[in-house]
């Protein structure tokens, strides 16, 4: 039967079995052979579609991780300047990057890193700027923020400006 990995922690995977098979959740481990064949970064992660074999009423074993259509990877520094890719999530449609307009101010360098990770993993990236009401339009930082937002929009990144106070 097939399912969706909802959570992956310390070698245990919470898998929601497809509705056709009952739609319940199982606590699963990877089949030993699968662990040996795959690198750490390629093990099952949240969002993966998997082939599962039930071993009891509430437990199962993951036999296969099905093909991923998208993913988000975090690069980890390694020895001697090498890097390791740490798979964070799979089969994502959109990555919404949230950053505040102020307190703390938006960090374009960090936003850029997330956008690159999204692009490399075939995920659509977008930016949500929060606390927009907290920055007065005539504040010096507001001009910088407007320029930054305009730059992202110019390169095709959707940007949403929000405010919990005003409902924007």
Question: Which stretches of residues belong to each language-model region?
Answer:
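N-terminal accessory targeting/assembly segments
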Residues: 1-108
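Structural and coupling elements of P-loop NTPases
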Residues: 2, 45, 95, 122-123, ...
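Short, well-ordered coil/turn elements that cap or connect secondary structure elements
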Residues: 23, 57, 120, 154-156
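Residue-level signal for inorganic ion chemistry
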Residues: 47, 118, 130
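Structural beta-sheet core signal
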Residues: 97, 127-129
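Short histidine/acidic/glycine/proline-rich micro-motifs that form metal-
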Residues: 101-104, 132-137
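Histidine-anchored nucleotide/phosphate-binding helix
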Residues: 109-119
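Canonical P-loop GTPase G-domain recognition
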Residues: 124, 134-168
